[in-house]
Structure formats: structure tokens, C-alpha cells
Amino acid sequence: MATARKPRGGAGGAAQPALDFDAPGEIVCGVDEAGRGPLAGPVVAAAVVLDPARPIVGLDDSKALSAKKRERLFDEIVAHALAYCVASASVEEIDTLNILHATMLAMKRAVEGLAVRPTLAKIDGNRCPMLAIRSEAIVGGDALVPSISAASILAKVTRDRMLVELHQQFPMYGFDAHAGYGTPQHLAALREHGPCEHHRRSFAPVREAFDLIR
């Protein structure tokens, strides 16, 4: 899955590059993920190139924001960013590659899906995916770098919406309440019903629940 926004055109339809004021001369994209820890569902990553001419007030780490504020900021980012792309790695890819490599893959897809080619990717965390452009890992970047904050919001809101859709198919697990994380409610449902096709069988609690129903 990848959702990308085309750049807004300037004179003659040429894209207007967004420059990060903290990195003069660079076209910077912020990159973050959502869903490394859950027991179910894909891992989702987003890459965002903000437009300094259209600042977005209130950007922060998505985990520090209420769901209502995340939804509002999601709409603002989609409307005002110069470019964005949301991508994912599937449960099958997570189980095959492991969650770290699947996360790097989702991030790579998000950056490569941007309609504006950045010169620098600022990645939340302590490691970067393999990219064709320069990249910089920033621990806690989702609370420090606006473009990473924006990516964090797009990734989390998108993933939360995906899990709400999964809840419609598998209401017994309560995906709409915990987004696939290993809450007591989710673990109890796993023990009672066993895992579904959207559970990550490479994760120990899911593997244990699968063994119980064999």
C-alpha cells in the first residue's frame, strides 16, 4: 500500500521545492513509522516534505496528541504539505523479514514514493533505511523535527484507520480499541479465538496462541 500526493505546481507547472529552514538549501523529507510493536496488522511509514510558506501549527509526536487532534492535523498536512507518501509492509513481509527490516522497507517505499525528490531524509529513530539520498537518524525526532512529526501523524492515523477496518471483519479481537497492540483484552481474545490471518506469527504471543489451537 502506498498513497502519494503530487507536488503543487508553480510557473509552467514546475514543482516548488520545500526547503527546511534548519537545513538551508536542502529539500528535506521527514520519515516516521507506526505499528512496530503490535501483534497484528501492517507496519506503516510516511514521508513528508513540508512547505515552509504554509506552516502547520501544533505538529508534535503523534503519541503525544489526542486522536481528535491527530485527525485535524492529518487533514492539514494532506492539504498543505508540498508532498507526502504513506506506505506499508505487510504482515507476511514482517514475518518473513522480521519487524526491523520490514519497517525499513516501509520507510524506503514512502521516501521513494514522494512526488518531490528530496535531497535529505530525516528519519525518526537510531537507524536509517537504505536510500538513494542522504539520510540522518534522529532519536526522538518525531518531537523535534516538524516534518518527522507530520510523518508520524500521517503514519499513525492511516494505520489506526486500517485497524478499524480490520475490526469490521474480526470484531472478536477489538482491533478498533487497541490497534493490534498486546493489551490484556487482545491477549485474552487470542487465547480464546486463536490468531487470524492479520496476526504476526513471528511475534511470541501470537505464536503461542497458534500453538494452543493446533
Swiss-Prot record:
Q: Which residues form the RNase H type-2 domain?
A: 26-214
For this protein, what is any one GO molecular function term? Answer: RNA-DNA hybrid ribonuclease activity
At the top level, the lineage of the source is Bacteria
Q: Where in the cell is it found?
A: Cytoplasm
What this protein needs as a cofactor is: Mn(2+); Mg(2+)
Gene3D superfamilies the record matches: Ribonuclease H-like superfamily/Ribonuclease H
Q: Which GO terms describe its cellular component?
A: cytoplasm; ribonuclease H2 complex
Q: Which keywords fit this entry according to its UniProt record?
A: Cytoplasm, Endonuclease, Hydrolase, Manganese, Metal-binding, Nuclease
Question: Which ranges of the sequence are coiled-coil?
Answer: none
Q: Note the PANTHER family from the entry.
A: RIBONUCLEASE H2 SUBUNIT A, RIBONUCLEASE HII
Instruction: Output this protein's name.
Output: Ribonuclease HII
